[in-house]
Amino acid sequence: MSGQKNAPLNVAIYCRVGFSEYALEIQKQRAAAVIREHDDWNLATIYTDFGTGPQFNRRPSFKMMMADCRKGLIDKILVRSISTLARDTWSCMKVLRELSALGVTIRFLDENVDTETDSQWMEFLNFYSALSAIWREEIGAAETSDIVPVIQ
């Protein structure tokens, strides 16, 4: 042991919001607070996509974040929720596998899942994203059905 300290982790924050500046600030503040809890974490940058929808090709900040990960500039990403990253299981797992291959870990704050420390993260995320997809389909079906709720 040489007594040298490891270099701090370069941690990025990824936020995606519809159009609410307030929701964005809450996401940023919450993730920044997590970074401050770790002396060996350095805030690298904050990537923010507004009202871009679930497709990755419509998210310029997401694409920039992935490019920075491929360049080795990011060690860890903090995201509010799995659904902030991806809305379907296949897309979520594709991104997580690429990040894992690059040595980049990701921490989902709402679900309290960290790919660095949770050995069962892939199984959990598969299950969670599948449930989220079913939930979104149910909501979409209810919104487009001919059933009109009765309000009393």
Where are the model-predicted features located?
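Short, structured surface patches at the beginning of a domain
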Residues: 1-151
